[in-house]
């Protein structure tokens, strides 16, 4: 791989420049010919991304002869500037490919263009870059991930069967500038509108437990007839469950989420959470890494259509 070898030389030249950057978790290769792939995630305070990282590391360990892995993430879901700095660090260090779950669908595009201009293969996972912004920058980045709208619609349809026409519901959205938050909200709306429910509130919970709790509490306070809370991820659903309990309305207000993290499973079992969607966190980064390896080898990813490699998403309910 001439491309990989040339990038090794660049990495050696700039190695000393990296000491002041954020700490990295790395799995080192035995030979310099193997490509180095950087996995850049969103908040590692979110169980979903820790599971994603664990899955990627396990895959690298099983395929240590094929590539090196460098992984990192940010402290909270809205720390876009830190994620930009991490990508800049990866460019300077001379990685061969970047697999990224962007904290913002638009703000990360300029630094991704820098990576592409530096000859780095870029693969987008989890949260899709805004296609219009990519087009404006005249770049293309493949997206490897699930249909978030479809997944949220499945959850919403399951909930709707347990409500009555005209029931009031609230939607707790993720970070509003992210495509996956927008798509999940759209899927929830699809299901609620089709079933004749009344969406009385839509607010952002920033993907986080505390913010999700605050938003859910406000909705419950403002809308005493609220029958359900649809959370764009399980972290916010955890916050919503606490808010429902604190309001003395356990069993009266249904809660659904998205991601199927470990912390939500006991709540599915005892009914505190009605349903969630599994987009297979442990495999998501792996799907992206597999795509990056194919692109580095000059191959076309399987099942790619219009720049998208769709991965599974499934409804999960009480066992």
Swiss-Prot record:
Its main location: periplasm. InterPro entries: Peripla_BP_I, SBP_2_dom. GO terms for cellular component: outer membrane-bounded periplasmic space. The keyword Protein biosynthesis does not apply. SUPFAM superfamilies: Periplasmic binding protein-like I (SSF53822). Gene3D superfamilies: 3.40.50.2300. It comes from Pseudomonas aeruginosa (strain ATCC 15692 / DSM 22644 / CIP 104116 / JCM 14847 / LMG 12228 / 1C / PRS 101 / PAO1). Keywords: Periplasm, Signal, Sugar transport, Transport. This is D-ribose/D-allose-binding protein.
């Amino acid at each position: 791989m001439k491309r990989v070898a040339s990038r090794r030389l660049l990495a050696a030249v700039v190695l000393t420049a990296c000491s002041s950057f954020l700490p990295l978790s790395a799995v080192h290769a035995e030979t310099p010919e193997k490509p180095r792939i950087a996995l850049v995630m969103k908040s590692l305070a979110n169980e979903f991304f820790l599971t994603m990282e664990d899955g990627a590391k396990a895959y690298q360990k099983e395929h240590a002869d094929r590539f090196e892995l460098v992984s990192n993430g940010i402290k909270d879901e809205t720390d876009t500037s830190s994620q930009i700095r991490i990508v800049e660090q990866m460019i300077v260090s001379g990685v061969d490919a970047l697999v990224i779950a962007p904290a913002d669908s638009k703000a990360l595009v300029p630094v991704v263009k820098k990576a592409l201009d530096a000859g780095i293969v870029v693969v987008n996972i989890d949260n899709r870059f805004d296609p219009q912004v990519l087009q404006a920058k005249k770049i293309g980045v493949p997206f490897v991930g699930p249909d978030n709208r479809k997944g949220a619609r499945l959850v919403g349809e399951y909930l709707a069967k347990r409500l009555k026409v005209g029931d009031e519901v609230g939607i707790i959205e993720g970070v509003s500038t992210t495509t996956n938050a927008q798509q999940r909200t759209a899927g929830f709306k699809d299901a609620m509108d089709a079933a004749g429910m009344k969406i009385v509130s839509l607010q952002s919970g920033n993907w986080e437990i505390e913010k999700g709790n605050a938003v859910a509490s406000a909705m419950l306070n403002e809308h005493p007839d609220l029958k359900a809370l649809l959370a764009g991820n399980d972290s916010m659903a955890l916050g919503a469950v606490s808010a429902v309990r604190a309001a003395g309305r356990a069993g009266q207000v249904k809660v659904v989420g998205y991601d199927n993290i470990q912390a939500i499973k006991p709540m599915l079992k005892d009914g505190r959470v009605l349903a969630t969607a599994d987009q297979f966190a442990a495999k998501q980064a792996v799907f992206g890494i597999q795509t990056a390896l194919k692109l580095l080898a000059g191959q076309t990813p399987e099942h790619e259509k219009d720049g998208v490699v769709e991965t599974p998403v499934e409804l999960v309910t009480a066992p």
